[in-house]
Amino acid sequence: MKFGWIKTTGNDLEERMESVKDALESSIPGIIAEKEEISSVRELGNIKIVSDNLDADVVLINKGEDLEILKSAKLSGKETGVYVVINTKEDEVYATDVSKLDFVDYVVLEGSDWTIIPLENIIADLFSEEIKIVSVVTNVKDAEAAYEILEKGVDGVVLIPKDINEVKDFSKLIERMNSESVKLDYATVTKIEPVGSGDRVCIDTCSMMEMGEGMLIGSYSRGMFLVHSETVENPYVATRPFRVNAGPVHAYILCPENKTKYLSDLKAGDKVLVVNKNGETREAIIGRVKIEKRPLFLVEAEYNGENLRTILQNAETIRLVGEDGKPVSVVDLKVGTKVLIKPDENARHFGMAIKETIIEK
């Protein structure tokens, strides 16, 4: 996972604390601050503080300072890092060497001209090391380039922002860099029938979804259906753009890092994966899960000779995504309708994808 920090900027403490507020409001996870600012930062909110003080969450020293400080910090349970300004080849060698010490978690690299920082050399030298490489930049364009160097890129970026808009753009960049892409394809509906009542799960998230977005749900791990969010206007009920009426308690849902969970296991605070019709994803936090007894529909579809099934609530507001990329209500499904699914050859063990023969029916 890529991460980002903000470095406090401003002529006085009040201005520098505005940087902290911007970071908090934009969900930036960390801030590099001066040691005299630590208490003020903590008063503003819960954010990882990186500073040259043992009161920080990450103890960060400059090149040339005593590494014994980091040893002590590590023993006290802190994360540690070294800040290196790259001006010469000797600086590059130092950064590589210090990164291989087992008590150093981060190496933070800054150069007077970012474009000539030998990040490629350092990334290549440290490819198999546990160290997290962090680059200091002054704009979002350079941040994106740093994340993508040698495909692997740096693990994190420190942005020295000009204004709140740049912080917001940085936050969006981090979200995009961490978004997973899933391969979707079309399956052909072969059967739709009511099956009686059961306990179905509504997932209410802390995010507003858009047309074409939903979640991947299914009775089988080998094929999950894109169940559309409640973003479609309806004369009978108001839209609920934060909600996916997902299906019964037994069904799988695709979560971040290609893991699955049972719908019955979800709870407030969990993260789920919002997926659009193009397979682009983003994370959403669950605010509430509602389990209620409702009438249910069985939906069967065929994909490459495989029979896939899912069960959904029997209601006109429950939708899959059709061949034209538009939502189609379950009450309008017909034999031959094509709907988006995520095919998967892997079985699942405690939500993890594994290579194993498994029969689901």
Swiss-Prot record:
Top-tier EC class: oxidoreductase
InterPro entries: DHQ_synth
GO molecular function: 3-dehydroquinate synthase activity; dehydroquinate synthase activity; NAD binding
Signal peptide range in chain numbering: none
Phenotype of null mutants: Cells lacking this gene do not require either aromatic amino acids (AroAAs) or p-aminobenzoic acid (PABA) for growth, and growth is similar to that of the wild-type strain in minimal medium with acetate only. One possible explanation for this unexpected phenotype is that a second, presently unidentified ORF complements the function of aroB' in M.maripaludis.
Gene Ontology BP term (one): amino acid biosynthetic process
PANTHER family, per database record: 3-DEHYDROQUINATE SYNTHASE, PTHR33563
Protein family membership: Belongs to the archaeal-type DHQ synthase family.
Entry function: Catalyzes the oxidative deamination and cyclization of 2-amino-3,7-dideoxy-D-threo-hept-6-ulosonic acid (ADH) to yield 3-dehydroquinate (DHQ), which is fed into the canonical shikimic pathway of aromatic amino acid biosynthesis.
Protein name per Swiss-Prot or TrEMBL: 3-dehydroquinate synthase
Organism this protein belongs to: Methanococcus maripaludis (strain DSM 14266 / JCM 13030 / NBRC 101832 / S2 / LL)
